[in-house]
Design a protein with these regions (language model features):
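Membrane-anchoring hydrophobic helices of lipid-metabolizing enzymes
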Residues: 1-118, 152, 159-161, 305-309
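Residues that cap or flank secondary-structure elements
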Residues: 3, 38, 95-96, 119, ...
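Residue-level marker for well-ordered alpha-helical positions
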Residues: 44, 101, 125, 150-151, ...
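General small-molecule cofactor/ligand-binding pocket signal
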Residues: 49, 165, 244
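Short glycine-/small-residue-rich flexible loop motifs, especially phosphate/cofactor-binding loops
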Residues: 12, 47-48, 128-129, 154, ...
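Non-catalytic C-terminal accessory region of glycerolipid acyltransferases
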Residues: 31, 38, 63-70, 105-109, ...
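Catalytic core of membrane glycerolipid acyltransferases/transacylases, capturing the structured
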Residues: 110-169, 192-202
């Protein structure tokens, strides 16, 4: 293990002894400076996203929302010590309630296979633990560019970690095989595909390049699709697992219809814990017109006033 990976690992273990409110205090101290640094990448991206999602919001309200989102970004970083820095079963004790478990139980009992769409919302690593504690699950993932981190991820997730399936041809075939046997797979639904490999569909009112893999798998296998996330409770009280049925049309043969339903499912999750979404992500960077500047580029160059939805 590389020295910097080992250092990160032992920092997580050391911070893991702290209660969640203390970790969030540290997270707030990390998130607030992102707001103070006007040209920080995280602030710029979050500000652009708020302009897209809330185009009619006045500047003061938008600034307050950006600040809140950046503080939650800090919380997302430090809460990893409570998840990866502890025994997995101890971390699961942070789950205080579950909403929508009846959908999950019914999907397992149906034997049709289950696709869990888990957006980058709240604490998705704790959601992985919760799912893995109830049923074997394989998650589709792209390995980190620096392979040294991959060993730490496997170690951190421990004995409750899901099976990790690479996002390549062999990995996708493994997902089909698992679903055909009535198994469970997890997919991050809002990862932006490469140009030409996705479908532009509305996301919070503006077309975004959307993955077609999940709708295609759902259409071809007949598996149930559910959305799920682990919401942070106020004042570090723990987490609430929320499970929602997928919108109608997510397995439609028409990809635009299916991807619109996929994005609507993500929206329904985000609307329940808005500031806990990963708003630092450049979700709308790729535009349908390749000659159109993406809004993040305009913002970085002081030209966000030219942006028109």
């Amino acid at each position: 293990m590389k020295w910097y990976v080992a250092l990160t690992w032992w920092m997580l273990r050391a911070l893991g002894v702290l209660p969640l409110p203390a970790l969030y205090a540290i997270g707030s101290a990390l998130g607030r400076p992102l707001w103070w640094r006007r040209h920080a990448r995280e602030r710029v991206h979050t500000d652009v996203n708020m302009r897209i999602v809330h185009p009619a919001m006045d500047a003061a309200a938008r600034d307050a929302l950006v600040r809140e989102c950046l503080v939650e970004t800090g919380h997302a970083v430090t809460e990893m010590a409570a998840v990866w820095g502890r025994d997995a079963r101890r971390a699961l004790k942070l789950v205080r309630e579950v909403e929508g478990q009846e959908y999950f139980d019914a999907a397992l009992q149906s034997g049709r296979g289950l696709i869990v769409a888990a957006p980058h919302l709240g604490c998705w690593e704790l959601l992985n633990y919760w799912l893995s504690a109830r049923t074997p699950i394989a998650i589709l993932y792209a390995p980190p560019r620096n392979r040294a981190w991959e060993a730490m991820l496997v170690r951190a997730r421990g004995d409750l970690g899901p099976e990790q399936v690479r996002a390549d041809g062999a990995g996708v075939r493994a997902l089909y095989k698992r679903l055909a046997a009535g198994g469970v797979v997890g997919i991050l639904p809002e990862q932006q595909p490469k140009r030409g490999e996705g479908q532009f569909a509305p996301f919070f009112g503006l077309d975004a390049n959307t993955m077609v893999l999940l709708p295609r798998i759902a259409q071809r296998t007949g598996a149930t699709v559910l959305f799920a996330f682990a919401e942070r409770l106020a004042r570090g009280a723990g987490f609430r697992i929320r499970i929602l049925p997928a919108p109608d049309g997510i397995a439609d043969p028409d990809l635009h219809t299916a991807c619109t339903a996929l994005n609507r499912g993500v929206e329904q999750c985000v609307e329940r814990a808005f500031s806990q979404y990963q708003w630092t992500y450049k979700r709308w960077a790729e535009r349908p017109d390749p000659n159109e500047h993406d809004p993040y580029w305009l913002a970085r160059n002081g030209r966000i006033g030219e942006w028109r939805q």
